[in-house]
């Protein structure tokens, strides 16, 4: 392998979720921030909640002129 062209690999990279959960993994970044993880994702928790859907229906209605009045 060529010298000096490879990224530094961190075996103890910290992943931080918006819910407050942290865990250690391997990565080329020392610290990673994520919005959702297995501790708060609806698939893993079994709870139904909206994830990143704010305004999608409103934008669709506005885009196609389907305003409800």
Swiss-Prot record:
**Binding site residues for Zn(2+):** 17, 19, 37, 40
Cofactor binding note of this UniProt entry: Binds 1 zinc ion per subunit.
InterPro entries from the xrefs?
Ribosomal_bL28/bL31-like_sf, Ribosomal_bL31, Ribosomal_bL31_A, Ribosomal_bL31_sf
* One GO CC annotation: ribosome
**Pfam families registered for this protein in UniProt:** Ribosomal_L31 (PF01197)
Q: GO biological process annotations for this chain's record?
A: translation
Could you say which cofactors this protein requires? Zn(2+)
Q: Which GO terms describe its molecular function?
A: metal ion binding; rRNA binding; structural constituent of ribosome
The family database entries (SUPFAM superfamilies) matched by this protein are listed as: L28p-like (SSF143800)
Which keywords, in A-to-Z order, does the entry hold?
A: Metal-binding, Ribonucleoprotein, Ribosomal protein, RNA-binding, rRNA-binding, Zinc
Q: Does the keyword Chloroplast apply?
A: no
Keyword Ribonucleoprotein in the entry? The reply is: yes
Q: Which family does it belong to?
A: Belongs to the bacterial ribosomal protein bL31 family. Type A subfamily.
PANTHER family linked to this entry: 50S RIBOSOMAL PROTEIN L31, CHLOROPLASTIC (PTHR33280), LARGE RIBOSOMAL SUBUNIT PROTEIN BL31C (PTHR33280:SF1)
Q: How does it assemble?
A: Part of the 50S ribosomal subunit.
Primary role: Binds the 23S rRNA.
Spell out the protein name for this chain: Large ribosomal subunit protein bL31
């Amino acid at each position: 392998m060529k010298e000096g062209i490879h990224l530094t690999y961190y075996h103890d990279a910290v992943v931080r979720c918006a819910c407050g959960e942290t865990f250690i993994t391997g990565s080329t970044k020392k610290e990673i921030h994520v919005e959702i993880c297995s501790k708060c994702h609806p698939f893993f928790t079994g709870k139904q909640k909206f994830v990143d859907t704010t305004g999608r229906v409103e934008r669709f209605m506005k885009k196609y002129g389907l305003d409800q009045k």
